[in-house]
Structures are given as C-alpha cells and as structure tokens.
Amino acid sequence: MSNAINEIDNTDLVFVFGYNPADSHPIVANHVINAKRNGAKIIVCDPRKIETARIADMHIALKNGSNIALLNAMGHVIIEENLYDKAFVASRTEGFEEYRKIVEGYTPESVEDITGVSASEIRQAARMYAQAESAAILWGMGVTQFYQGVETVRSLTSLAMLTGNLGKPHAGVNPVRGQNNVQGACDMGALPDTYPGYQYVKDPANREKFAKAWGVESLPAHTGYRISELPHRVAHGEVRAAYIMGEDPLQTDAELSAVRKAFEDLELVIVQDIFMTKTASAADVILPSTSWASMKACLLRLTVASSVSSRRLSRSGI
C-alpha cells in the first residue's frame, strides 16, 4: 500500500475495485466509512451488490472479465476532457503517448456492451476520480487472483499516475493482501521464484550470494513449482511429498477433484496447523502449530510497516 490506512479517513475520494473490505478487512472498512463521514465520495466497482457498495455514491456493476475495457475507457475520458495532471505526467511518468494511443479507441460508447456499464456512468466515474483533490484506490483478491490481474493493476495505477494521485497525502494505490503476514512471508522469500527481498532464483549472482549466506556449495537454478501446478506435477512423479503450513488446499484450491487425487497419490503429506483442517485430516503426519498468541513475532502489515506481537499464552506447539 502506498497509503497508511488512516490516511483513507481524509481522502476526497475512495475508489474500491474488486474488493469488499466490509467482509474481508473490517478495520479498512471502518476507515472507508470515516472517509464517507468526512465528505469523501465513494465509488465501488464490483459485479455484485457487495456490502461496501451500500455506502457508495456510485456502484459500477461491470460484467465479469471487463476490467480493462472499463479502466481504459475511464483513462480515455480523463485525457479527452483534459482532466489529467499535465505537470505530474511530464515530470514523474514515462510512456504517456503510448498509453494515450492504447486508450484512444476505448470510448465509453464502444465498451458499453462489453462492460454492461452505460457511457454516462463511465464518464461520471472518470470525472469524479480525476477531479477529486486526492483519491485513493483500493483493490483486493478480486483483482489479483483473476486472470487479468497484472493488466488490471497496471490499468489502475495508470489512472493514479494520470491524475497525479501518488506521492501526496491521502492519495495512492493500495493492494490489500489476503492473509495475516502474507506481506512478510513474501518479503522473506516464501515464493517459488524468489529469495528474500524478491531476488530472483534464476539470477546466478543471487544464487551464489544465498548459497554463501546459507553455507551450502550451490543452489538449484530452476524455480519452484506453483501451488496450481501440484496436480500435474504429482501425476508425472515430479512431486512425491508435501509439507503444508497454515494452508488448507483441500478446502480452498481450485479444481478440488484434481487436488484430492494429487493428495491421494502423494507418498507423504505433512501438515502443520493450529486447526484440524480438511487437509490435515488427509495427512500422514500432523504437527500441532503454535498460534500467534503463543510466540513473540515480527509481522509486516499491509502498509509494509513492521509490528511486534508479544507472547500471551504458554507455548503448546511447534
């Protein structure tokens, strides 16, 4: 997040895209409500009439899969009506002419059928966002876990740069992560293709550096497998065992029938958790884990600020 969460209270406009803080992040939702009380306009973009849309000044109920068309049409309106921040674009961005050419063909009228949103609504949303003194965009898993995720994030951040809504108080772009300390886990390298600090596995210099730091001769040059690849890799004998910590793939992953078949074929499944999850029920070995209340730990929050939690309960697990 480029904003502190409490900055949302005093922004002039909140653009909530593919995200329902009322259900998934109640504390963030409270700050959106505070902004509303302080006079901010709220735009919610979601196919469903989600809880957060109930307090919105405008709910854009776009069709599934039409994110890019909608956002490019908003960019088209902002440029066409001369609502963009010329000084910011000239001094602090690159590629404006390329972006202009991309959105030139996305008139609001041309995307009405694609998005299910009227041209007048698209123009209204673009004007509201561009004319706000400060505007904060919030998006969540509805964006990042969608097949257009990367392109949608680029389109949202392009709107922020187009209007100068970066680098000033109460304005910014804010991807809201899905689970506790997921920011810290990713920062520490709990990803299939990076070491700590998002240093890529495929870079020989990074492999050499971490091999030296970890006291080993060398590290593999290939990246790890993504969770979505598990059924395929198990079927081809490339994965024979799984060690799962704080995750429940037999409950939450896509294509559950394929995932169940993969777990049946694994030679060894170890689950470390504080709950008897569905995945734990299918495990060969269950390791009781220590909860956050039983350990002293450092966490990284949504805003990339660190916080320390103190032990409140006696330790009863790993």
Give a label for each model feature.
Residues 1-181, 185-188, 200-318:
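Cofactor-pocket helix-loop regions in the catalytic cores of large enzyme subunits
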